[in-house]
């Protein structure tokens, strides 16, 4: 009699497409796990009818509005298509504000299908959401002011190095944008644990970009960054403690959200992915 054979082990990258704990190893394993999370989120949304229904409403409503704007013009077919795409691109940030509560409810509903304990939705008001969007836009802009000043100094005192510095500036800009894509995605994935103490304090450690400018001449600038970034202390703490994970997660989310209409379709997947990341990081954290 031959001994029964066991099923071959599932390769790690394929296992990352199913809900499960963080990899035991850091480095490339954690980066790959983070990179796979948006695809995991998409897979869970498609497989769960309730999540798919909740995710479809923002897409249909927003796309329908853009279609109505295009049909309201007197242009031909090509002109209407151009207006549809222009409206889509111009209003691309709007779904985050208009459908914020839908995405928050989606985040809470996704926890059980992801193998996590049930929680309730975190529901900030519209005024808070608008204020946070303005804060983030300001942070994205003024966070690059030192790069612009450095470029001006290079042009003034070392013109020959200016072309090379342009590439450095673009790389820094891309990194800064990716950083805030991750922060926004993680923010959308937050839920409320009913058993947690009310008003739990956010981490008080300054984020890296605040500490970077804590030099005598730039302390006021550093303080401004600290005040503007206060709503995202939880997310920034996770970025600092799991850099490989958030780099992979950010690259995966950025690839999904790079094209406006694709971003609208895949944003629910990014929200579900963020829920899974936050849940598994919480599970892996040592008890307080």
Where are these regions (language model features)?
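Helix-coil boundary and N-terminal low-complexity module in membrane systems
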Residues: 1-152, 213-237, 241-245, 249-253, ...
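Selective recognition of hydrophobic, aromatic-rich stretches within alpha-helical transmembrane segments
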Residues: 77-114, 154-223, 261-285
